Regions:
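Class I S-adenosyl-L-methionine-dependent methyltransferase module
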Residues: 253-266
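Core catalytic lobe of class I
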Residues: 2-6, 10-251, 265
Length: 266
């Protein structure tokens, strides 16, 4: 198995690199302290109404109360703080639900107030298409989502970003290139019955090029069908992922084996 060979090449103090762990991310992060350069992930958006079944994922039930969801997110960011190397970033793709438009803002506010992280940037991701909001007389069709760039509060002026120097002033002060906080990328790499809420390899590749370097270790706490890992292989980054669904882990491994064995197909 090609992906098994890739895993065996590298370990971080006994933990396999380039592997998706079929477990809760809070368990994985206990073994990753201080080893990760960046987190790139898209959490469940908590868009399913309580007592409603059958949307989004094959295992996870995306229907917490607002308070439960916020507390859960705070616990996850405590884990991120423990695993990130100095000046590492969290790139957190999140959007709001049609019926719960405030949760996203509540989460961000509590992260800033109650965690060691602050919001460094907001990237707008324009997707190629959007489902028309034909049932609403007053809500717009949403064709954008957001990637929230979080850094530690103590590293607001030093967190990793790959902006290059375009010129240097007489005083020695560098001028950096102009990089817009706007990315156009595909919606996804085709959703599956296992996970209807995936993002695209194209989006993740652009984020990797902005915030990581070749050989960096990237962690995805909600790996799903392996999109972050897929992008990492292309851009020569190492990855570790967590995923609750055994079936999604199996799907991702098959997908990544194809990526490794037949890169010319992509």
């Amino acid at each position: 198995c090609l992906i098994e060979a890739l895993k065996k090449k590298k370990k971080k103090r006994g933990m396999e690199i380039n592997k998706i762990y079929n477990e809760d991310c809070l368990l994985t992060m206990k073994r990753l302290e201080g080893k990760v350069n960046a987190v790139i992930t898209s959490p469940p958006y908590n868009i399913i109404r309580p007592n409603v079944e059958g949307r989004g994922y094959d295992v996870y039930k995306d229907n917490k109360t607002n308070d439960e969801y916020i507390d859960w997110t705070l616990d996850i960011f405590k884990g991120y703080n423990s695993i990130l190397k100095p000046n590492g970033v969290v790139l957190y793709n999140m959007s709001y639900g049609t019926e719960n438009t405030v949760l996203m803002s509540l989460v961000i506010a509590d992260l800033i107030r109650k965690s060691d992280f602050t919001l460094a940037d907001i990237i707008v991701w324009k997707k190629q298409m959007a489902t028309p909001n034909a049932m609403s007389s007053n809500k717009l069709t949403r064709i954008v989502e957001y990637v929230y760039v979080f850094c530690r509060k103590s590293e607001f002026d030093t967190f990793q970003c790959n902006k290059s120097v375009s010129s240097v002033r007489d005083t020695g002060q560098p001028n950096y290139e102009n990089v817009f906080n706007f990315i156009t990328a595909k919606n996804n790499d085709n959703s599956t019955h296992l996970n209807k809420a995936t993002y695209s390899t194209e989006l993740v590749r652009k984020l990797l090029l902005l915030y990581t370097k070749e050989g960096d270790l990237v962690y995805d706490s909600f790996m799903g069908t392996g999109t972050t890992a897929n992008a990492c292989i292309i851009e020569k980054r190492d990855y570790i992922g967590s995923e609750l669904s055994e079936e999604q882990c199996k799907y991702a491994e098959k997908r990544l084996n194809i990526r490794i064995s037949q890169p010319q197909l992509f």
